[in-house]
């Protein structure tokens, strides 16, 4: 079983898919995003990795509760950005 399936099963096993609220999962995503910002500010690579993983998990939770495919969402996002021509310069301008 791959990680996505294990994560999805975790949400199923805890009744989150059946009884969860999308807003609750969105709030968890926001909390984890705050932890990511803290990790970046502290230059803590381990905490950064943990936060990125947690954000991924909470976003999968949003999708499970809403009944949408996570990878379809990522595919949509990619198709929105794929033709953009911008480039981030060394001085931080885009």
What is the predicted function of each stretch?
Residues 1-52, 56-94:
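Flexible "arm" and connector segments at domain edges
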